């Protein structure tokens, strides 16, 4: 069987359970890894990316609460790097355990990834990316008083949430390193939380206060390492049009042109499914012989047994 190079972008539900303790998240990560090892067993080369919204949000709360002259709060880019280490550590250990249980001898590595953005991206003037937990209006005002530069908005009636800029990625600094690891058959965890956003200043990289959409970062990484497939794992088995309406339709095999027509019809929610669709379109346009798949973690077994989920091709 020909080895496929696959980038798998994990949704937040693959890491965080209702219990935000380290032990609970470690357990959730291991259950996720058990599903992903099925790809390895059939010879695929895996590059794993993941979200970090809840984790980085909680770290920011801790930073703000203990901010003092002796223990100054770290900026958002540094906190993003902290979350990559945290989640990467959990995931590496989970892979090592599950691989041992399956009798597979493979190495696993986490790469703290820097995602290059344009410092002039319009996103910096319009923070939209929600991070961290939901607050009541009073709690949000309290958080804002602690960190006056933070922006909070009401999120679809579920409460108030901090929002930060989310510029589009234009490069991945560590892509050549990740490529070498994958070619050496190392399972690689990278672009966690979309990577640490950095902007070029001459021959330097400067961290910026932002969060990169992990799906867009995963697409850029898949493009740069020449992945054969991009799998975006989310909470549903398939993408739907006319969602929650009597004529709801499940999409199985769909072309880029069809998806672009659906976007014109406003078929996909801007805050959730639309970025995933845009990611899939961008990837397939950049690599026309490849395919993108949007499905759920629980549907991975069906995907491996036969084509499942929503499969996007040129």
Curated annotation (Swiss-Prot):
It catalyses: hydrogencarbonate + NH4(+) + ATP = carbamoyl phosphate + ADP + H2O + H(+). Its main location: cytoplasm. Keywords: Arginine metabolism, ATP-binding, Cytoplasm, Kinase, Nucleotide-binding, Transferase. GO terms for molecular function: ATP binding; carbamate kinase activity. It is an enzyme of class 2 (transferase). It is found in: Cytoplasm. GO terms for biological process: arginine deiminase pathway. Its EC number is 2.7.2.2. Pathway: Metabolic intermediate metabolism; carbamoyl phosphate degradation; CO(2) and NH(3) from carbamoyl phosphate: step 1/1. InterPro entries: AceGlu_kinase-like_sf, Asp/Glu/Uridylate_kinase, Carb_kinase. GO terms for cellular component: cytosol. PANTHER family: CARBAMATE KINASE, CARBAMATE KINASE-RELATED. Belongs to the carbamate kinase family. This is Carbamate kinase. It comes from Latilactobacillus sakei.
